[in-house]
Swiss-Prot record:
It is found in: Cytoplasm. One of its GO terms (biological process) is lipid A biosynthetic process. Belongs to the transferase hexapeptide repeat family. LpxA subfamily. The gene is lpxA. Keywords: Acyltransferase, Cytoplasm, Lipid A biosynthesis, Lipid biosynthesis, Lipid metabolism, Repeat, Transferase. Pathway: Glycolipid biosynthesis; lipid IV(A) biosynthesis; lipid IV(A) from (3R)-3-hydroxytetradecanoyl-[acyl-carrier-protein] and UDP-N-acetyl-alpha-D-glucosamine: step 1/6. The keyword Lipid metabolism applies. This is Acyl-[acyl-carrier-protein]--UDP-N-acetylglucosamine O-acyltransferase.
Length: 258
């Protein structure tokens, strides 16, 4: 059985595993690498120095590896790197990185990216995330593991969203969202704990309670942020589920939602 449709346009220099399926009218550029058992639907365009792993499913009209929407970009050989087992739905756009950023845009494994989502230059997306339709990341955004972005979520440049966090429909994320927390609103504010997401991913009642105490410390005790952070970091020394806050606070450039 022919795995590549005869109307697909694939540069001879592109490197595709023999098991890759390519649909009608798809275009694949010379610097693209695609791993085993990845399936690409019709009318997709994959360009740039793009590496795609194994067992991905890319739907029709996806645009992957085009140049970043950055006026400073001067055709440098930056990259897009996509891991394994991802579902990338219709009309998604993933851009290359920039030399003023980390030089690459990275997507991990087992992510579910729904239609019309956009990942700008130098974004880093972890594993097992869900992006609902039309979620968009500006440049230099970092998304942790098991994050859920509601439809039409917009994330500002350089923001971070921590592991197991969740945003509501049309959230405008202008500051960092800590791990396990929910955020909602045009200028996103704290909206409680993603306790259901934690339960679904095997956290115990005791672990959820410990994270709930962190939420209360940050938002309900009425103490200054630096004092709240110090208290959380003390508890993180003995509670493994809180250790993620140590790195998150240390790497936060925009501050957290309040």
């Amino acid at each position: 059985m022919t795995l590549i449709h005869p109307t697909a346009v694939i540069d001879p220099k592109a490197e595709l595993d023999s098991s890759v399926k390519v649909g009608a009218y798809t275009v694949i550029g010379p610097n693209v690498q695609i791993g085993a058992n990845t399936e690409i639907g019709p009318h997709a365009v994959i360009n740039g120095h793009t590496s795609i792993g194994e067992n991905n499913r890319i739907f029709q009209f996806a645009s992957l590896g085009e140049i970043p929407q950055d006026k400073k970009y001067r055709d440098e050989p930056t990259k897009l790197i996509i891991g394994n087992g991802n579902t990338i739905r219709e009309f998604t756009t993933f851009n290359l990185g920039t030399v003023t950023g980390i030089g690459e845009t990275r997507i991990g494994d087992d992510n579910w990216i729904m239609a019309y989502c956009h990942l700008a230059h130098d974004c880093v997306v972890g594993n097992h995330t869900i992006f609902a339709n039309n979620a968009s990341l500006a440049g230099h955004v970092t998304i942790g593991d098991y994050v859920v972005l509601g439809g039409y979520t917009l994330v500002f440049q350089f923001c971070r969203i921590g592991d197991y966090a969740m945003t509501a429909f049309a959230a405008g994320v202008h500051k960092d969202v800590p791990p396990y927390f929910m955020a909602s609103g045009y200028r996103a504010e704290p909206a409680g704990l993603n306790s259901e997401g934690m339960r679904r991913n095997g956290f115990t009642a005791e672990q959820i309670s410990a994270v709930k105490d962190v939420y209360k410390t940050l938002y309900h005790r009425g103490i200054p942020f630096e004092e709240a952070k110090a208290d959380i970091l003390r508890h993180a020394e003995t509670q493994a589920e809180l250790a993620v806050f140590r790195d998150f606070f240390a790497q936060s450039a925009r501050g957290i939602i309040r």
